[in-house]
Amino acid sequence: MKVKFRLVAAVCFYFAATCAVQAQDLGPHFKKVKDGIYVYAGVLNEANVTIIQTQEGIVLIDTGQTPKDSHIVMAALKKLASQLVRFIIHTEPHADHTVGNFVFSPPGIVIAHEGATASMKKADNPATIEKRMAVSPEMRDAYKGYRLVTPHVEYRDKMTLNVGERTLELYYLKNVHSEADTAIWLPKERMVFTAAAVTVKRFGNHRPFVSIPDTLSGIKMMKALNPEVVVPGHGDPGSVKILDEMEKYYNLLLGRVGAMVKAGKSLDEIKNELKIPGTEDWAGKDRYPNNVEAAYRGVTGK
């Protein structure tokens, strides 16, 4: 009976804290997307961080573009409830999603797809960190105590994590952006986190191993989940239209590049001549050429 009473009390405290927070102002860059779930990005199109409250503690999806963002999220956590960060799940290993791990771990356990640790260690460079710290006194202060925190757990292909009342399903996204991309699906909440496979009005950075056909397969998989809420790696959360628009873009890009290859155009000619309608206001235009290169690889196999 005592155990039952304690459990009920804990659950009541959790929901009371969650309800109370709905009236609080976490800051101008936080958006509530579901009960107990908040998305943060300091600047539009920078990496998102998501706070997921559970009865057993906080789950974070990524840790922020910079440690300054991570500390803002930590301040929000203190307003939300006196809960510890239980898990940090990374959608990718790049620094704009992982550099703030040291702010939350310990106690947070970091989870990512296999290959993330190797990628993070390879990219970790003291000179790069010093350059980032030199941006401003505030940024230098935010980096105090910095150390590289790599995943404690690496999964392969698929993993299911049950935390309190919430279930999180992790799926590997192959060749979509980094060496270790993860889509995260919350079936009860009908939310999907797309990693940087999908962004909003923003050209992706397509490294030489990125495959647009594989990216389209990942988008198809995520659409098949029938999500109500889509949280991209970069950009505002929204509906399944986010997936539809990115799918449309990649299909159009592949089709146009394929037609130009068939007409005898070289890669350089395609990059100079091809314009995709509807992308005029997209950010990251310097990345458009590598989008064309990825489409060219997808069409020709070269």
What kind of feature is each model-predicted range?
Residues 1-12, 19-20:
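Bacterial N-terminal signal peptides that target proteins for export
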Residues 25-27, 31-33, 57-59, 63-67, 118-252, ...:
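Metallo-beta-lactamase
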Residues 30-75, 182-196:
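Conserved beta-strand hairpin/beta-sheet module of binuclear metal-dependent hydrolase folds
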Residues 15-18, 24, 224-225, 237-302:
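Accessory terminal helices/loops
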Residues 30, 55-59, 67-112:
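Active-site metal-binding motif and surrounding structural segment of the metallo-beta-lactamase
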Residues 36, 52, 62, 77, ...:
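Divalent metal-coordination and catalytic microenvironments
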Residues 45, 63-70, 94-97, 113, ...:
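Solvent-exposed, acidic/flexible segments
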